[in-house]
Each structure stands twice: as structure tokens, then as C-alpha cells.
């Protein structure tokens, strides 16, 4: 089958780039905008909570996250091998033993459900969901650009 146009993941923004919440609300609406000149500043502008969700918002505030998203990866899928502008915090909400991340050192990691993980996504990485029917669901937030190590 032809998989070139298959969407392997969906993301929903948990933060807006506008205090009145009228800016871009879903990162998916802005695919391609986080590239090139000004991309870092654009990505860092997503700091305003979109939902009255005290537990999620306290998680965001604790780590000083921006552009935090709920990310869903489909079964039997792999993301492109890429690198990002900033380091990330991952909180796996629903995962399975057939999900893993391949990080810059080419080592595969299984991120366990309910644990918090620092990932240096400024280095090349990808994610796999090899399960036949279970999706992978993570909350992923970008750390401040001046973050150098896990604090």
C-alpha cells in the first residue's frame, strides 16, 4: 500500500501564542511555520494556557514549558528522523511496550507511562509505535532555549 501521504500522528496544542486565546490554538494549524528565520521566537511564543486544567497547567508551569502539546501517534507508524529547536519534556499518558524513541546516540528507549522524561531533541531522533492497534499518547512540552541540562 502507498503510505507516502499517511498521517502518523496528531497534535493538539495545550498553549496558545496569544493571551486572549485568539492566536494559533493548534500547532497542527501551523505546520511549516516553525522553520527558518524567526522560528525559535515563534515556537517560544506559545506560553498561554488554553484550558482550565490545573494538573496539566501546573506541570507546564513547573518545567517552564512552552508550545506544550498532546501528541498522538498511530499504531504501526514511525515519525520522520528529525531534530527540533528545543529540548523537550515527555509525559507518556498512554503507551505500550512496542513504543520507543530512537535518540541522537542511536539508542532505543521505551518511555514508560506516567514517568517524566527529559529528551534532547535538538539532536536527531524519531519515535516508533510498532503495536498493531494501540495509539501512543504523550504530553510534550518545549523547554526554554537556554536549558542546557536536566534540572
Language model features with spans:
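Non-heme Fe(II)/2-oxoglutarate
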Residues: 1-58
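Catalytic phosphate/metal-binding cores of nucleic-acid and nucleotide-processing enzymes, i.e., regions
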Residues: 38, 106-111, 117, 147-150
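A short glycine-rich, His/Asp/Glu-containing loop-to-beta-strand
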Residues: 55-75
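Short, conserved beta-strand element in jelly-roll/cupin
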Residues: 72-73, 83-99
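Tight coil/turn sites that cap or link beta-strands
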Residues: 74-76, 114, 122
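Short beta-strand His + acidic residue motifs that chelate non-heme Fe in jelly-roll/DSBH
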Residues: 79-81, 99-101, 119-132
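A short hydrophobic beta-strand segment most commonly corresponding to one strand
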Residues: 89-92, 116-118, 132-150
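A short beta-strand-loop-beta hairpin characteristic of the jelly-roll/cupin
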Residues: 92-113
Amino acid at each position: 500500500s502507498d503510505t507516502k501521504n499517511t498521517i502518523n500522528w496528531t497534535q493538539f496544542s495545550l498553549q496558545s501564542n496569544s493571551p486572549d486565546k485568539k492566536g494559533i490554538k493548534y500547532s497542527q494549524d501551523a505546520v511549516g511555520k516553525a522553520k527558518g528565520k524567526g522560528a525559535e521566537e515563534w515556537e517560544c511564543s506559545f506560553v498561554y494556557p488554553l484550558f482550565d486544567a490545573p494538573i496539566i497547567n501546573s506541570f507546564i508551569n513547573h518545567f517552564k514549558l512552552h508550545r506544550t502539546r498532546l501528541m498522538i501517534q498511530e499504531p504501526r507508524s514511525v515519525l520522520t528522523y528529525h531534530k527540533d529547536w528545543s529540548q523537550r519534556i515527555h509525559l507518556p499518558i498512554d503507551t505500550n511496550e512496542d513504543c520507543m524513541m530512537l535518540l541522537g546516540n542511536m539508542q532505543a528507549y521505551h518511555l514508560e507511562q506516567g514517568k517524566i522524561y527529559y529528551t534532547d531533541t535538538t539532536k536527531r531522533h524519531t519515535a516508533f509505535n510498532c503495536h498493531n492497534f494501540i495509539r501512543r499518547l504523550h504530553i510534550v512540552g518545549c523547554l526554554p532555549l537556554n536549558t542546557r541540562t536536566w534540572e
